[in-house]
Every structure is written in structure tokens, then in C-alpha cells.
Regions:
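Short, Lys/Arg-enriched N-terminal segments with co-localized hydrophobic residues
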Residues: 1-10
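General secondary-structure edge motif
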Residues: 2, 33-40, 93, 132
Length: 196
């Protein structure tokens, strides 16, 4: 299948590595897979500012708790890069929180990003700190999903050693597109497939 190939320790689409969200150093913007266009089109959307992030979350271009949290984290970074003013940042943070008021990951990611803002630092330094923190949130999510995959693989192996056929049922938005890479409940399935 064109969307699920983990042979290279990542999700591939047409043999090209993709994550659901990433920071592009060249264009200095955040990029996402626009999930409203799937499965018929693969559209990469650039998030250049706070408004772009708000639209991406509200219009469900990004879906799944971990991905929404990461997008919100990048939203704090992009808002600071754009605004730099303390009062305007407080308003921007509230706008981000209002995009999905029940999304727990969104709130903890925003609070984590806000905890890194120290207005006694130079603006460029704060920007760098916020970008590093948003990227760190993404890396931590990928690491969590990989660990879920590794641990889940052991469970699948143990069960499949006892039976010939194994059916796995997942629910909710637990796949690759809900996280940065791998997925939560689906990560063990990907690991099992690649490790026969």
C-alpha cells in the first residue's frame, strides 16, 4: 500500500519520507499534510503564521490529539515570531486554545511552550527557544510511538505464537496521521508487519 511502508524506520508515501508536520528550514515555515484532502490528494500546506495554524486546527487539516498538540506548539512559535509583544502573545495564546477547547494535548503543548517564554531575553533568542521546544515535542511524540510499537510487537509475537491467526481491532484516531509519525495503536501493527 502506498501509505504504509516502515522498512526505513519511517512512514513513506511513494517511497518518500513524510511526517504529518515538520519545520522546513529553507522556507522557515511549518508544513503539514492537509488531511481534509486525503485520500484523494496529497496536499502539503504551509503554516506561516498564527492565522494559518488556527485555520489548520479549526478546519481539521490536522487531526488526532498528538498532532493537534504539536501544531499548537508550532502556533505559539509562529505567533511569537510574528508578534513579539507580551500582550499580543497572551491574546494569541488564547486564540490557539479556543481552536479546540476540549483538546487536552493542545492545552498541555501550549502551556509547555508558554513556560519557555522569558521576555527578559532578546526576541531572536526566544524564537530559537520556542522553535527548539516545538521540535522537541515532535521528537518526543515520535519516540513514544516507536516505544508503543516495540512493546506492542512483543505482545503480538506472544499472542501469535499461541495461535495461527491474529486479528487486531483499533478504535479512535490512532494511526500515523494522528501523530507525528508511526501512530499509537497502529505502531505495533506496523512493527509486526515489518518483523514478520
Amino acid at each position: 500500500h502506498r501509505y504504509y511502508n516502515l522498512k526505513h524506520n519511517c512512514m513513506l508515501i511513494d517511497n518518500k519520507k513524510f511526517e504529518t508536520i515538520w519545520y522546513d528550514d529553507k522556507s522557515e515555515c511549518v508544513q503539514i499534510i492537509d488531511q481534509t484532502k486525503l485520500p484523494f490528494e496529497l496536499i502539503i500546506t504551509k503554516l506561516n503564521n498564527l492565522d494559518d495554524v488556527i485555520i489548520a486546527i479549526k478546519e481539521m487539516k490536522v487531526r488526532g490529539a498528538p498532532l493537534i498538540g504539536a501544531t499548537a506548539a508550532f502556533g505559539v512559535y509562529l505567533a511569537f515570531r510574528e508578534l513579539k509583544d507580551k500582550d499580543q502573545m497572551l491574546l494569541a495564546i488564547e486564540k490557539i486554545k479556543q481552536t479546540r477547547p476540549t483538546a487536552v494535548n493542545l492545552f498541555w503543548a501550549v502551556e509547555r511552550m508558554v513556560s519557555k517564554i522569558d521576555f527578559s531575553y532578546a526576541n531572536k533568542e526566544i524564537e530559537n527557544i520556542l522553535l527548539k521546544e516545538a521540535l522537541k515535542i515532535c521528537e518526543e511524540d515520535k519516540d513514544c510511538c516507536k516505544k508503543i510499537g516495540e512493546n506492542g510487537l512483543e505482545i503480538i509475537k506472544n499472542i501469535s505464537n499461541e495461535k495461527k491467526k491474529l486479528n487486531i481491532l483499533t478504535h479512535c484516531n490512532a494511526g500515523w496521521l494522528a501523530t507525528i509519525d508511526w501512530g499509537t495503536a497502529t505502531a505495533p501493527i506496523y512493527y509486526a508487519r515489518d518483523n514478520n
